[in-house]
Amino acid sequence: MPCAGVLDSQSDRMVIDPDAWSVERRVVARDLLDAGDARGAYAVLVRDEPASDTDKVESHMLAGFIALRAMGDGKTAHRHFSTVLSEATIPGTTSRALYWQGRSLEALGDLRSARVAYEKAARHVTSYYGQVARARIGLQELPIRSLPNPTATDRATFGARLSVRAIDLLYRADQKELALPLVGALAGDLKSPGEVVLLGALTQRYKDPRATLVVGKAGLNNGFAVDALAYPTGGIPRFQPVPGSIETPVVHAIARQESAFNPKAVSHANARGLLQLLPTTAAKTARNAGVSFDAKRLTSDAAFNAQLGAAHLGELARAYNDSYPMVFAAYNAGSSRVTQWIQRYGDPRRPDTDPVDWVERIPFAETRNYVQRVMENTQIYRTRLNGRTALMIDRDMGQRSGDRTAGR
């Protein structure tokens, strides 16, 4: 691979955009890994010198993964994951680094330290790697934290904010689109968990799940226990599932990631509505389900969109024997891509393929992130919607399981 040699010799200090160069390094490293050249892939990454924290994290995570899972070098891998942990500022990155620290320590035979790393990761209950870590050490529950109680000071400070008054006036005027950016700006600035709860309550009062989600995400990123706000349950209207539809928590999980609960969303690829369905896919699903189809309803009728999305996801679940990483990857990137990845990386439904590894090997960053986000969303929504705290991510990740159709 000629470009690999260039990347191996080029110092990023000499290039105009080291972050763009870093992205190219990771692409080439993955190509080399797919070709069986793990050491060449690692060599490309160790010379990486990105400027942004995000690219530093991604570069070290991939280098550590290659060192651990392809080269069997737990010590080197642990060093990379420790670097990521020192740079981590949000729960998702922290739990990711801690989980892989645990895996590298396991490989080194230090089981006690590995468990400590997993236990630390497991505290981040809303993150994919926090949930995977919980399952790895046998924690079978996924507790959703109660919202903090706002203090009298929180209420006084919040009520005196001009931005709060402006948001309330916009809601009263039925101007949710104008209120949303103001909500987002305020949510990012709030330093008190009590005020975050009050802002979330304001958005809920006006039945605006999009804004509630924005508030909840900002709160989680600031380390506040606002799980219920970050996973709103009012974004999907009641709908009649057709036989064989996927479980309702997955519908919420997908909509949260696909459209952030915007029923009128239309992507550059013409995917439409809450679950971002392509009209051709939706029409085929409707035909299979015996439902009359009208493409305009994908953005005008949220319940119709949810019904067809649930039915299509049910079709994918049957095709992949309930392997949710495969289902979600196919929903995002297409079934033909999943077929390619099975050929390259193995079948995550089989015991000889680690489904966590399989997800990490997905070559598209967007799809890799998508699968992990929808997986974590699903675990939380099972608790939010069904009142169940049992963690089922191990079952979801790979091996065949029981019925998970709507209503179960």
Predicted feature locations:
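Long, internal scaffold/assembly segments composed of regular secondary structure
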Residues: 6-7, 16, 170, 187
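Helix-turn-helix repeat elements of alpha-solenoid scaffolds
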Residues: 1-7, 31-43, 68-82, 137-144, ...
